[in-house]
From Swiss-Prot:
2-oxoglutarate binds at Y134, N200, K208, K243. GO terms for cellular component: chromatin; nucleoplasm; nucleus; pericentric heterochromatin. Residues 370-414, 423-442, 480-598 are annotated as: Disordered. The lineage of its organism: Eukaryota, Metazoa, Chordata, Craniata, Vertebrata. It catalyses: N(6),N(6),N(6)-trimethyl-L-lysyl(9)-[histone H3] + 2 2-oxoglutarate + 2 O2 = N(6)-methyl-L-lysyl(9)-[histone H3] + 2 formaldehyde + 2 succinate + 2 CO2. GO terms for biological process: androgen receptor signaling pathway; blastocyst formation; chromatin remodeling; positive regulation of cell population proliferation; positive regulation of transcription by RNA polymerase II; regulation of androgen receptor signaling pathway; regulation of gene expression; regulation of stem cell differentiation. CDD domains: ePHD_JMJD2C (cd15715), PHD_JMJD2C (cd15577), Tudor_JMJD2C_rpt1 (cd20465), Tudor_JMJD2C_rpt2 (cd20468). Its cofactor is Fe(2+). A zinc finger (C2HC pre-PHD-type) spans 752-785. A zinc finger (PHD-type) spans 689-747, 808-865. Keywords: Chromatin regulator, Dioxygenase, Iron, Metal-binding, Nucleus, Oxidoreductase, Repeat, Transcription, Transcription regulation, Zinc, Zinc-finger. Binds 1 Fe(2+) ion per subunit. This is Lysine-specific demethylase 4C. The gene is KDM4C.
Length: 1056
């Protein structure tokens, strides 16, 4: 078998290739992989390998029924129209036998089907029904002991450098994971951690369907996902690594994104290549095994892999050792940040290099004595908390932070009856991951090998790894820090809206000429945008800046027992609940609160406007006579304010409700600094998917039709009305952009045009299908409104608005205008009835943000707007002894009380072997060490913790924290110890829930009031007193009362 040298790339169509090696070819994994890439297999991002018939990884699978799946996950899917979000809920542990019975039961079994195409249709049609259960992330291998060919536990690739040089084991990444699937269990769209290779072998059972997107088109999928899920995208630039996003093939086809699909049968391998996005599902009960690996070609991908920045538990591997060992000629340049390299996705990996050969030779010498030696890794089990602070150790250039994730144990019963616990931290390759502990009976201990060296212990986290990677669960998981390098700017498809600076806001005293504002089509450039795509930008072919050395040595993983460095890759989503609302839901309107509806007299009575947000709109209400000059003045003024686009401003209001009226007035009275006279481009804030509400519109064009390649769009101003918009937001084709450009309204000389969806004039208008006009921002935010022509934002369809919405009254303008018109939107918080016009809410400063499909905009009224800094600032206030404060009494009401003493308590933070976490463990509860005398143990040290149930649990120590407790005394003399966050000073504003239950202590006439515990226990329950009206009818005989009671119960049963 020769590695072909080809000048032109093979496999130009990027189709998934299938290989059938002979036994001789099959013996050398790395050599055959290089051969596959020489044929162009890597261009598809996925390839199938059918091993020789005589090769068997395991002779019999009948003895794994007692294998324990410690943390199965139930996959709940929400969404519609080919766009879905997957949530994972952890279930009780079960054995493989129990799981198989469940998978084959009537509820979860595979439906009848004609062929795989028919089954695929049924999968996408029924995806949101009957949430399946997935047995994922079981750390270990079920290969037989003597199998050396393509043994997933020891592939002997360059990724092994991580464990050999740094002593770090990342479970699921460089150790194998087992996965037990059933019909419809899914692994969502993702690439591997650090964009590594992965290998997946289907041991037995029903097939598995795969979808793959060529690496050279990966960026297109990312942009599409950013458009459909803007909220997730703004929260994390690499949100696809959360493995929660499902996009159907029909949607990919409509957007022209190339993809291919293939079915993996039992006994076949699937290999994914660097930066190859893939997804898929199981046809029924099966068992697969997978892990990650690497080649020399991967190193350049690893340098620029886009990492998840919103969680601490994502895998991040320091590339320093790989560059130093396998790219020594580029090492110094790379350390200096000058190693700029363009990734060629078509280039195959070399069969070998001098550096790889030298490394393999050294490795063989070391491994000769223990070539076939594998032992179980010990792990710790323990409950885990949702949030933990990072604690790290420096180990051979690797930073080992405190695992934020939950670990589960794999227990293997050895013949010596010694139980070995394995921790499952983060899953890595092709299967959805779930933190897992599995128990193997004594007769199984001879057949199941656990990956790892004798000196290393495995860690098992509660993270779930998707089918071919990891999935998300509802619990928090151990954290492998994935923070992006500080020196490399992160760029995302959408920028988080900046808050307008008051100095930029201005309101001219008199209407000015539009020519001064629209002189050059009003374009603005954002100066802070990076010109080079960086570490956070993924694998866009072209720029690959090097990472400075300061960050390269930060391979962060959870610390492991006995000084070994071990971690597992984790892909579970943080605790969150699936959306329970419907985009079309209307909430019955009630009287608005005083907080949201100030009593303001009608402007029509020419009374002076007192609200700062409404002052600039005084001449724009539709009940006033049309005033085109006032519209020009308003449009010209807001064109100078960020975001400079009359449509994007939906997500960045000009008015700041938190500011004083004087501040807001000053912003509008500030003079214009200077008029923009040079063309420029900025990134629109409104994602393209907000314009495409239903899948019906998807066929019109791909997203961002009028965007530049870098995601920016030209800002252009109308020569007459001075409104400024992005070309992409307003739908302006490039051939129409010119000096003197006119908006749709000015082209038709519709000087008196007004929006049919609100009560305000001005802004960017487009014509509706019934020949009226509507603000583009109103059409985006009102759920039932559609753009018939999405790219050009024309032919707005307002005919689907229900009567209930048209009857809603705006809390902002109902006292300013006499008529009820337009269509209101409502707060997205629960069933909040607050309603308002889009432009009224925008002018008043109501927070609106892009939401994930199938929702458009997430709206938060003032009542539900949370300021995260309020509570933290309150907790910073010092409380002293003798101070009068307010806190909760035992009777659940709040009273004034006096601080009698302030004490501090040191708590230890430990992670148990099962992955759970405790932040409030007392030092004396650690029985394996006298912490009161010797002090705390070393970070990462294994300890024994005595739990309140009296049992001892294994755990790892991760740090300590100090909590202050306040002993307070109420007027009735009772005392209680409270934390700072439960105490309010007299000068703090009390939350509503506290105000509602705040009381003033009375005399001791009602003693029971101050003994809530007794009341709850029922010891002081008030006796019932018989009414005088029924004294003559009361029978004291208990036998008679029992007879009546039994007779009554019999009568009730007969009626039922």
């Amino acid at each position: 078998m020769e590695v072909a040298e080809v000048e032109s790339p093979l496999n130009p169509s990027c189709k998934i290739m299938t290989f059938r090696p002979s036994m001789e070819e099959f013996r050398e994994f790395n050599k055959y992989l290089a051969y596959m890439e020489s044929k162009g297999a890597h261009r598809a991002g996925l390839a199938k390998v059918i091993p020789p018939k005589e090769w068997k990884p395991r002779q019999c699978y009948d003895d794994i029924d007692n294998l324990l799946i410690p943390a199965p996950i139930q996959q709940m899917v929400t969404g519609q129209s080919g766009l879905f979000t997957q949530y994972n809920i952890q279930k009780k542990a079960m054995t493989v036998k129990e799981f198989r019975q469940l998978a084959n039961s009537g509820k979860y079994c595979t439906p009848r089907y004609l062929d795989y195409e028919d089954l695929e249709r049924k999968y996408w049609k029924n995806l949101t029904f009957v949430a399946p259960i997935y047995g994922a992330d079981i750390n270990g291998s079920i290969y037989d002991e003597g199998v050396d060919e393509w043994n997933i536990a020891r592939l002997n690739t360059v990724l092994d450098v991580v464990e050999e040089e740094c002593g770090i084991s990342i479970e699921g990444v460089n150790t194998p994971y087992l996965y037990f699937g059933m019909w419809k269990t899914t692994f969502a769209w993702h690439t591997e951690d650090m964009d590594l290779y992965s290998i997946n072998y289907l041991h037995f059972g029903e097939p598995k369907s795969w979808y793959a997107i060529p690496p050279e088109h990966g960026k297109r999928l990312e942009r599409l996902a950013q458009g459909f899920f803007p909220s997730s995208s703004q929260g994390c630039d690499a949100f696809l690594r959360h493995k929660m996003t499902l996009i159907s093939p029909s949607v990919l086809k409509k957007y022209g994104i190339p993809f291919d699909k293939i079915t993996q049968e039992a006994g076949e391998f699937m290999i994914t290549f660097p930066y190859g996005y893939h997804a898929g599902f199981n046809h029924g009960f099966n068992c697969a095994e997978s892990t990650n690996f690497a080649t020399v070609r991967w190193i350049d991908y690893g340098k620029v892999a886009k990492l998840c920045t919103c969680r601490k538990d994502m895998v991040k591997i320091s590339m320093d050792i790989f560059v130093r060992k396998f790219q020594p000629d580029r090492y110094q340049l790379w350390k200096q940040g000058k190693d700029i390299y363009t990734i060629d996705h078509t280039k195959p990996t070399p069969a070998s290099t001098p550096e790889v050969k030298a490394w393999l030779q050294r490795r063989r010498k070391v491994r000769k004595a223990s070539r076939s030696f594998q032992c179980a890794r010990s792990t710790s089990k323990r409950p885990k908390a949702d949030e933990e602070e990072e604690v790290s150790d420096e180990v051979d250039g690797a930073e080992v932070p405190n695992p934020d994730s939950v670990t589960d144990d794999l227990k293997v019963s050895e013949k010596s009856e010694a139980a070995v616990k394995l921790r499952n931290t983060e899953a890595s390759s092709e299967e959805e991951s779930s933190a897992s502990r599995m128990q193997v009976e004594q007769n199984l201990s001879d057949h199941i090998k656990l990956s790892g060296n004798s000196c290393l212990s495995t860690s098992v986290t509660e993270d779930i790894k998707t089918e071919d990677d990891k999935a998300y669960a509802y619990r928090s998981v151990p954290s492998i820090s994935s923070e992006a390098d500080d020196s490399i700017p992160l760029s995302s498809g959408y920028e988080k809206p900046e808050k307008s600076d008051p100095s930029e806001l201005s309101w001219p005293k008199s209407p000015e000429s539009c020519s001064s504002v629209a002189e050059s089509n009003g374009v603005l450039t954002e100066g802070e945008e990076s010109d080079v795509e960086s570490h956070g930008n993924g694998l866009e072919p072209g720029e690959i800046p090097a990472v400075p050395s300061g960050e390269r040595n930060s391979f962060k993983v959870p610390s492991i027992a006995e000084g070994e460095n071990k971690t597992s890759k984790s892909w579970r989503h943080p605790l969150s609940r699936p959306p329970a609302r419907s985009p079309m839901t209307l909430v019955k309107q009630q009287a608005p609160s005083d907080e949201e509806l100030p009593e303001v007299l009608s402007i029509e009575e020419e009374v002076e406007e007192t609200e700062s947000w409404a002052k600039p709109l005084i001449h724009l209400w539709q009940t006033k006579s049309p005033n085109f000059a006032a519209e020009q003045e308003y449009n010209a003024t807001v064109a100078r304010m960020k975001p400079h686009c009359a449509i994007c401003t939906l997500l960045m209001p000009y008015h700041k409700p938190d500011s004083s009226n004087e501040e807001n007035d000053a912003r509008w009275e500030t003079k214009l600094d200077e008029v923009v006279t040079s063309e420029g481009k900025t990134k629109p804030l409104i994602p393209e998917m907000c314009f495409i509400y239903s899948e019906e519109n998807i066929e019109y064009s791909p997203p961002n039709a009028f965007l530049e390649e870098d995601g920016t769009s030209l800002l252009i101003s109308c020569a007459k009305c001075c409104v400024r918009v992005h070309a992409s937001c307003y739908g302006i084709p490039s051939h129409e952009i010119c000096d003197g450009w006119l908006c749709a309204r000015c082209k038709r000389n519709a000087w008196t045009a007004e929006c049919c969806l609100c009560n305000l004039r001005g802004g960017a208008l487009k014509q509706t299908k019934n020949n009226k006009w509507a603000h583009v921002m109103c059409a985006v935010a009102v759920p039932e409104v559609r753009f018939t022509n999405v790219p050009e934002r024309t032919q707005i369809d307002v005919g689907r608005i229900p009567l209930q919405r048209l009857k809603l009254k705006c809390i902002f303008c109902r006292h300013r205008v006499k008529r009820v018109s337009g269509a209101c939107i409502q707060c997205s918080y629960g069933r909040c009835p607050a309603s308002f016009h889009v432009t009224c809410a925008h002018a008043a400063g109501v927070l609106m943000e892009p939401d994930d499909w199938p929702y458009v905009v997430n709206i938060t009224c003032f009542r539900h707007k949370v300021n995260p800094n309020v509570k933290s600032k309150a907790c910073e206030k010092v409380i002293s002894v003798g101070q009068t404060v307010i806190t909760k009494h035992r009777n659940t009401r709040y009273y004034s009380c006096r601080v009698m003493a302030v004490t501090s308590q040191t708590f230890y933070e430990v992670m148990f072997d099962d992955g759970s976490f405790s932040r409030d463990t007392f030092p004396e509860d650690i029985v394996s060490r006298d912490c009161l005398k010797l002090g705390p143990p070393a970070e990462g040290e294994v300890v024994q913790v005595k739990w309140p149930d009296g049992k001892l649990y294994g755990a790892k120590y991760f740090g300590s924290n100090i909590a202050h407790m306040y002993q307070v005394e109420f007027e009735d003399g009772s005392q209680i110890a409270m934390k700072r966050e439960d105490i309010y000073t007299l000068d703090e504003e009390l939350p509503k829930r506290v105000k509602a239950r705040f009381s003033t202590a009375s005399d001791m006439r009602f003693e029971d009031t101050f003994y809530g515990a007794d009341i709850i226990q029922g010891e002081r329950k008030r006796q019932r007193v018989l009414s005088s009206r029924f004294k003559n009818e009361y029978v004291a005989d208990p036998v008679y009362r029992t007879f009546l009671k039994s007779s009554f119960q019999k009568k009730c049963q007969k009626r039922q």
